[in-house]
């Protein structure tokens, strides 16, 4: 293994699946969101891309730090307990965290509190932003994200700062809140969280957003042509999300709550959600499910029943 390979593997191994539906992604493809929420969509395996993501996060932190040192705008990145400002809905299964809140961003209304949102972009994307109509027109996902933040924190405006990773150019804009976006996204998230099967894809299987931005493995799982690599509680037919906790899940096979570590590990009683198998069900017996694939029968059973 070369040094570059080791760098890449370190990034890949360091990934952790998100426990909730984040406001940064909730405006996106509902099928992909469902697969990610069920810990079934393959994680990135490209270390270089993961390093770019990490670099973007570091740049965004640096911008917040520079704003604090400038002193022109008052910045608060954490609450009184030193925690990042967060919001959550639907029993903790949907949520988000903001880069901070600011005052004095508008000289005409210096005491107004605004959301602070910092992004980074490569040169091509940055030029698209500069030449476009607005930040919200630039990215639907970012538009939904900032609208959800403003509504969740009951603020009317947000200060946007976008940093060009190629030449350090900076773009700023103040975005106005719009009614209804958060409510719409909460309803979307609720449908995803409650669903036992993935929502229909908004794209055809040959759409460029699938072919260009997904690996072959990701495409196969997205199109339900292949089972996920990861076996865990979230893609098991026995589990379900609980809405009266903090992102809680329950196993109906053992009639008990399951914590994050248990969810990630799974157990020998795992049975695939039938929607992920994506074959006609031929029969159910003793916890096992039999599927028909042409003339062949395929049985998905807990490990202790395998081969019986």
Region roles according to the model:
Residues 55-59, 141, 181:
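Soluble or luminal CAZymes and related metallo-dependent hydrolases
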Residues 84, 145-147:
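Glutamine-centric residue-chemistry signal
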Residues 111-118, 156-160:
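Conserved active-site beta-strand-loop modules that form the wall/rim of enzyme catalytic pockets
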Residues 102, 118-120, 162, 253:
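Residue-level recognition of conserved beta-strand positions in structured domain cores
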Residues 128, 136-140, 148, 152-255, ...:
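Metal-dependent nuclease catalytic regions and adjoining charged, substrate-binding loops involved
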Residues 1-115, 122-127, 133:
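Metal-dependent nuclease catalytic cores that hydrolyze phosphodiester bonds in DNA/RNA
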Residues 92-93, 138-143:
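Short, glycine/acidic-rich beta->alpha junctions
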């Amino acid at each position: 293994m070369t040094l570059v390979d080791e760098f890449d593997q370190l990034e890949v191994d360091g990934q952790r699946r998100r426990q909730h539906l984040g406001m940064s992604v909730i405006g996106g493809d509902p099928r992909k969101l469902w697969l990610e929420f069920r810990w079934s969509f393959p994680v990135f395996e490209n270390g270089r891309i993961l390093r770019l993501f990490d670099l973007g996060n570091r740049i965004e932190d640096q911008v917040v730090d520079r704003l604090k040192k400038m002193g022109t705008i008052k910045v608060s990145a954490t609450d009184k307990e030193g925690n990042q400002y967060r919001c959550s809905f639907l029993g903790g299964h949907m949520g988000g965290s903001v880069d901070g809140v600011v005052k004095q961003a508008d000289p005409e209304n210096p005491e107004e509190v605004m959301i602070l949102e910092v992004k980074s972009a490569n040169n091509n994307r940055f030029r698209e932003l500069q030449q476009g109509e607005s930040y919200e027109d630039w990215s639907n996902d970012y538009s939904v994200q900032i609208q959800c933040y403003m509504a969740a924190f009951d603020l009317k405006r947000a200060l946007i700062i976008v940093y060009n990773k190629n030449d350090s150019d900076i773009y700023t804009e103040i975005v106005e809140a719009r009614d209804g976006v958060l409510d719409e996204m909460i309803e979307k998230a609720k449908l995803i969280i409650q669903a036992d099967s993935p929502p229909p894809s908004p794209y055809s299987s040959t759409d460029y957003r699938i072919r260009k931005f997904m690996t072959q493995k990701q495409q196969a799982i997205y199109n339900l042509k292949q089972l996920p690599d990861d076996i865990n509680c979230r893609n098991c037919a026995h589990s379900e999300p609980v809405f009266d906790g903090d992102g809680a899940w329950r196993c109906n096979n053992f009639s008990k709550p399951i914590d994050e570590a248990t969810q990630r590990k799974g157990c020998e009683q795992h049975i695939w959600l039938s929607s992920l198998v994506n074959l006609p069900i031929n029969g159910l017996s003793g916890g096992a499910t039999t599927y028909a694939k042409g003339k062949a029968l395929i049985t998905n059973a807990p490990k202790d029943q395998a081969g019986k």
